From Swiss-Prot:
Biased composition (Basic and acidic residues): 1-10, 19-32
Keywords: Metal-binding, Repeat, Zinc, Zinc-finger
Annotated organism of origin: Encephalitozoon cuniculi (strain GB-M1)
UniProt cross-references to InterPro entries, sorted A to Z: Znf_C2H2_sf, Znf_C2H2_type
Zinc finger (C2H2-type): 103-125, 136-158
Key word Zinc present: yes
Disulfide cysteine pairs (residue numbers): none
GO terms of molecular function: zinc ion binding
Protein name: Zinc finger C2H2 protein ECU11_0990
Chain spans, region Disordered: 1-38
Organism superkingdom: Eukaryota
Length: 165
């Protein structure tokens, strides 16, 4: 018994034939499967066609695009095809990242996305802390804080009221 070549069509149970080379399923009798006056004779069954050629992380770049092919003396063939263009949302995100402000350290050329992170980094070069001279500290454990709200949250741990008692 000879095995069918991958280019031959495989007949399905429900009157559909599968073309493995193109990755499409064709319907023989589409009269009962019409929806809202649109007949779709060919449909890409899954992303398996793309999966054979691309790594898993690359598959996410594919999007479904409708394709219509004119035929001689019949209805046009309409099917969905996986296109490899990136999604517009992805492009917007890349442009947003490109226009974002960056802050660079003059000493080591490291780059940060916020000025606060750059200040903390520069303090490491100097060997000094970034705590202000009038920093807030916990009267119980002497832990220091740069913001009053952080001290208040910490004081709950010791069950201290706002006055420090």
């Amino acid at each position: 018994m000879e095995a069918e070549s991958p280019k031959e069509r495989v007949q399905g149970v429900s009157g559909e034939s599968w073309d493995p080379e193109r990755g499409v399923k064709e319907r023989e009798d589409t009269s009962s499967k019409k929806g809202k006056g649109v007949d779709i004779p060919q449909v890409l069954v899954s992303q398996s066609c793309a999966a054979r050629e691309c790594a898993k992380d690359e598959i996410r770049k594919f999007t479904k695009v409708p394709v219509e092919i004119d035929t001689v003396g019949g209805k046009p063939l309409v099917f969905m095809m996986w296109a490899s263009e990136e999604k517009p949302v992805h492009r917007k995100r890349l442009h947003a990242e490109a226009s974002r402000d960056v802050f660079g350290c003059e000493s080591c050329e490291e780059v940060f996305d916020s000025f606060k992170k750059l200040q903390l980094h520069k303090a490491q070069h100097k060997g000094t802390s970034t705590e202000p001279s009038n920093s807030l500290f916990c009267p119980v454990c002497k832990k220091t804080f740069d913001e009053k709200r952080k001290l208040m949250l910490h004081s709950r741990y010791h069950k201290i009221d706002k006055d420090g008692r």
